């Protein structure tokens, strides 16, 4: 309640919109479109009585479900599998419910678009996408990373205009008669509607073959007098003929463009494979949205693989629901943080619920193959390549230290923590086979914890110089010095002025303050087979409580730099107490280069991008960062300098330093406070005040990123091994992938329930033929598109399926 007014879910507006649409459709000529399957599905769950009418309208060409998928999601911060699954699930659901497969792609209001979107669109049957936001292809055809091409927007021989004077962004204020409680005047809805009537029509013929007149906008209800307005215009306007329509009606006029979509003239192809950057603040604001979403995605992926392989896909329906729910977390006003506090809390609850369910499904599948054993655990590897990673296990009892073995092999043990009742043991897993499992045994041992007094540390292949205020130099065996402190110390916190809103930075003032002078080395210690360097610091304002600093209230931090035997990366754990306004916090990872070109992992691919500076101060202007998923870094002549992240996707490569943005504190409530419609001060959470913890790692891969293990290691860093109490009791089904640079995206039951689907992605831009070994009971294998329509039978070589992988291709294999 706000001054006697009432707030309701946005779903109430969606329901009113669809109710009104269906009422106007009864005139026999009205047409309408819905952007996303999510909206329509939830409406039909509440109103199944309208399903037949909607199906009839769709088949009559009067209703079109557009091809954004389940939701219009952000496609820069999500796993490639979610980018694909969003469109797959929305398209198949639309076809099932409406009897018509959606064919018009849609990404309206999405904040940028990724380089593998054209391939995903084409694999789902879409050749045309008339809406992309807010950065666009610079030519009519958009060709993606793999060469797949789609037609963008409406060709020049058409004119597109708004046919309504209604504000596209005006919210629905409370009904003035009842202040939101519902009455006869507002049809018991509680709000004063904003409707899109046809009150701004074009009146004269132009050179265009057709004029597309849009009647839509955010939170705008359908007009009630559109059909009457069309009839009146046709009766009085001799130059133009008006009619209701949907995008499908334009396909006959697009025949020429669509006929050449696979081989358009070179001058008509956009010069860029992605439509970024834009709305850069969205990659940092409310950072927990990104962190928790990343964690949840990987949990669902692991659960799906093991439920399919070990539990015969028994939970396929539940997992499909989890994927659909994840598309809501990935929605372009959800993961992007462009929402109010209540919405943020709802999203955190949603992700927590998905994590809980996925964890239970994962445990249920894996425990089918283990026996109870108090001092043993089994490590399951859902990746298709051998994997080792730090693992933490809880054992009963109060252990001072621990010994961990895999067979006769002793494993590195890093830390043993206890509270008198249970002990947490962290150790390095052995190399667990891809899609396999290994049992390890734990037993008590003496504690191994000693302080280290030398400030030059050599451990796990790294040599580190620990200065009083930060790490000044890092060298690696066979590569030499890979970090220097010319501009920043390694992992240093950098405070940067960032005046703006959740969407982005709105000024050119990006002044920085280094935090190394306020940082102090607090200790170095050897914890078992690891070495931990500890630093802590605080901003000077913390010690001046009675001084006035309008922008920094309180800021402190601790950092642990962890070297682990058997683990190829240097971990950086940063905890920040953040109470600022109009600032951005970056972590600096300086290399030994002066590079301004970076390498960035994107959903289902990798791009090399150049440094750029801020492009403006308008809403959505880019501020100098690029989006990445698991890692970004610098390719040197001899090695890849990569910085892994766990849900902090905003990077900038500047004069040889990889800068990772981890926090923002925007103050401007753009689009979140709209007094003309309502007053609700429920947006202060956008400043992210509180304590935050971030996990990063430095990885050095010899040679080129296309050939070394950087992509695989970053995947392990984000989602390692599944730990299940007990010893392996039976062998796992034999699944094996032999590939140089092709990764497994998922293994899942087919959507139609007939067989198993394996999705692979080539991640280096180098074609190869991979070998896929499956259980002997599975005898049929064909490639398929993303919608799982069969394409080409696969050749066998002995026990292996031979799967051709084109450069950057996503290949789906159906096996039965």
Indicate residue ranges for each PLM-predicted region.
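C-terminal domain-boundary segment and adjacent tail
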Residues: 34-38, 122, 131-146, 202-282, ...
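Catalytic domains of cell-wall/extracellular-matrix polysaccharide-remodeling enzymes
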Residues: 98-138, 193, 226
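Terminal accessory/targeting
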Residues: 1-28, 167-169, 178, 186, ...
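C-terminal (or distal) subdomains of carbohydrate-active enzymes
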Residues: 117-120, 136, 154-155, 167-179, ...
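Acidic, His- and aromatic-enriched active-site or binding-groove loops in soluble protein domains
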Residues: 49-68, 118-138, 142-151
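Metal- or metallocofactor-binding catalytic centers and their adjacent structured scaffolds
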Residues: 25, 258-375, 720
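Alpha-helical scaffold elements lining the catalytic groove of polysaccharide deacetylases
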Residues: 75-96, 158-171, 194-204
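N-terminal catalytic cores of secreted or lumenal carbohydrate-active enzymes
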Residues: 1-81, 85, 94, 123, ...
């Amino acid at each position: 309640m706000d001054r006697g007014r009432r707030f309701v879910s946005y779903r109430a507006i969606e329901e009113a919109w669809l109710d009104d649409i269906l009422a106007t459709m009864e005139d026999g000529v009205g047409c309408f479109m819905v952007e996303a399957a999510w909206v329509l599905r939830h409406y039909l769950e509440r109103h199944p009585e309208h399903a037949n009418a909607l199906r009839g309208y769709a088949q009559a060409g009067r209703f079109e479900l557009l091809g954004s998928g389940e939701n219009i999601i952000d496609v820069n911060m999500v796993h490639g599998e979610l980018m694909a699954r969003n469109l797959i699930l929305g398209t198949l659901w639309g076809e099932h419910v409406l009897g018509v497969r959606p064919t018009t792609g849609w990404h309206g209001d999405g904040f940028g678009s990724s380089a593998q979107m054209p391939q995903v669109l084409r694999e789902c049957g879409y050749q045309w996408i008339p809406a992309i936001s807010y950065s666009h292809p610079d030519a009519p055809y958009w060709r993606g990373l793999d060469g797949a091409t789609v037609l963008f927007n409406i060709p020049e021989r058409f004119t597109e205009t708004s046919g309504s004077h209604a504000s596209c962004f005006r919210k629905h204020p409370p009904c003035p008669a009842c202040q939101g409680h519902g009455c006869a005047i507002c049809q018991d809805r509680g709000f004063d509607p904003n409707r899109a009537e046809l009150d701004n029509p074009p009146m004269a013929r132009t050179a265009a073959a057709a004029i597309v007149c849009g009647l839509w906008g955010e939170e705008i209800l359908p007009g009630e007098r559109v059909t009457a307005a069309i009839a009146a215009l046709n009766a009085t306007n001799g130059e133009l003929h008006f009619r209701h329509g949907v995008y499908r009606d334009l396909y006959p006029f697009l025949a020429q463009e669509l006929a050449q979509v696979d081989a358009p003239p070179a001058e008509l192809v956009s010069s860029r494979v992605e439509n970024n950057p834009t709305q850069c603040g969205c990659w940092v604001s409310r950072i927990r949205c990104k962190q928790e979403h990343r964690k949840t995605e990987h949990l669902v992926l692991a659960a799906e693989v093991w439920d399919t392989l070990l539990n015969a896909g028994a939970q396929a329906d539940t997992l499909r629901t989890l994927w659909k729910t994840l598309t809501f977390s990935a929605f372009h006003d959800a993961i992007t943080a462009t929402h109010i506090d209540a919405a943020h809390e709802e999203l955190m609850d949603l992700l927590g619920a998905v994590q809980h369910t996925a964890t239970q499904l994962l445990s249920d599948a894996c425990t089918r193959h283990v026996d109870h054993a108090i001092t043993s655990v089994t490590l399951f590897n859902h990746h298709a390549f051998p994997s080792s990673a730090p693992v933490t296990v809880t054992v009963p009892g109060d252990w001072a230290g621990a010994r961990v073995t895999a067979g006769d092999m002793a494993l590195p043990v890093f830390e043993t923590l206890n509270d008198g009742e249970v002990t947490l043991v962290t150790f390095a897993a052995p190399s667990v086979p891809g899609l396999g499992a290994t049992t390890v045994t734990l037993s008590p041992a003496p504690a191994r914890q000693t302080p280290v007094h030398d400030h030059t540390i050599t451990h796990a292949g790294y040599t580190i110089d620990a200065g009083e205020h930060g790490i000044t130099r890092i060298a690696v065996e066979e590569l030499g010095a890979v970090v220097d402190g010319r501009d920043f110390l390694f992992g240093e916190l950098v405070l940067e002025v960032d005046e703006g809103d959740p969407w982005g930075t709105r000024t050119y003032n990006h002044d920085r303050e280094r935090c190394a002078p306020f940082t102090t080395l607090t200790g170095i210690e050897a914890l078992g087979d690891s070495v931990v360097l500890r630093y802590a610091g605080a901003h000077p304002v913390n010690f001046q409580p009675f001084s006035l600093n309008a922008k920094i209230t309180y800021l402190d931090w601790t950092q642990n730099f962890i070297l682990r035997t058997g683990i190829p990366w240097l971990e950086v754990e940063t905890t920040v107490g953040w109470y600022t306004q109009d600032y951005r916090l970056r972590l600096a990872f300086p290399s030994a280069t002066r590079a301004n070109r970076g390498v960035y992992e994107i959903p289902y691919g990798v791009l090399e991008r150049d440094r750029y500076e801020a492009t403006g101060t308008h809403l959505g202007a880019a501020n100098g960062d690029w989006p990445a998923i698991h890692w970004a870094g610098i390719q040197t002549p001899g090695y890849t300098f990569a910085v892994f992240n766990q849900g902090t996707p905003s990077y900038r490569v500047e004069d040889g330093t990889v800068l990772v943005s981890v926090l923002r504190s925007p103050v401007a409530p753009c689009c979140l406070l709209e007094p003309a419609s309502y007053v609700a001060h429920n947006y202060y959470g956008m400043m992210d005040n509180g304590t935050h913890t971030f996990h990063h790692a430095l990885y050095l891969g010899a040679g080129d990123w296309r050939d070394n293990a950087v992509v695989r290691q970053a995947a392990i860093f984000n989602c390692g091994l599944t730990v299940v109490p007990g010893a392996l009791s039976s062998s796992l089904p034999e699944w094996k992938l032999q590939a140089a640079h092709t990764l497994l995206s998922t293994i899942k039951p087919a959507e139609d329930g007939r067989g198993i689907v394996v999705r692979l992605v080539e991640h280096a831009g180098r074609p190869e033929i991979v070998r896929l070994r499956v259980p002997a009971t599975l005898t049929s294998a064909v490639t398929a598109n993303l919608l799982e329509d069969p394409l080409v039978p696969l050749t066998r070589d002995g026990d292996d399926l031979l799967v051709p992988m084109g450069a950057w291709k996503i290949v789906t294999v159906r096996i039965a």
